Structure formats: C-alpha cells, structure tokens
Amino acid sequence: MRPDLSLHTLNPSQSPLMRKIESQMIAAVNNSVNWKSANTRVEFIEENNTSKVYLHDNHIATVGDDFMEIFDGGWQSVTTKSRLNSLINAFCNGVTDGIFQKDFQWYIRDNNVTQDFVNGYIFA
C-alpha cells in the first residue's frame, strides 16, 4: 500500500478537477494493482514494488515507494502532460513540482527549481 495522499496539496495553477481516468490510474498505482482503461495502463511489478504507467503503450512513468521517474513516451502532448501532473500531484509535492509548457517547450519544476524536460528525470 502506498502512503496516505490526503495530506498532499495540489498546484494552485492546476485544476483541482482530475479526469476520472487519472483518478483510476492513481488508485491502481496506490493499490499496487494492474489496471487498464482506454489509452492508459498501469502495470504493477511485484519484484521491485513499482508501478509502470503507459499512455498509448508508451512508458511515461515508473512509481516506486520513494521515487517517481518520468518520460514523455515520445509525445509531448497535452494528455501526456496531464497524466504526468496527476501522478506528480499524487506522489510528489504538487505545489512545488510539476511539468509545464512555455513557447512549445516542456519544463520540469522540482522544489520550485525549473529546468528543461529530460526523459528519465527522477523525483525523489
């Protein structure tokens, strides 16, 4: 079972309304179960207690007990960014961490420090 998320706060610049599919995705990661709906899939890997998240069969995140590794899956789309930010809000600090886009370029914000987006970035 993943940590209690009730103490996490959301980034005020993001909508507090989460897509139903994203809520279900987070529940699957939180409950360490396999899950699939439409274009999104969670695969729980029991050997190392991680969950891999896929969008259109492209790996976009790995969530472990104390880290989250993110990828764009080859597509820097609005949907990919939405899935990643939902995961960040659930398993990182949604106030200081996130993915955003400016002038068609993706950026990572980690502890309020901004850098260019890189695949394989780890929030720990």
Where are these regions (language model features)?
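Terminal leader/tail segments of proteins
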Residues: 2-124
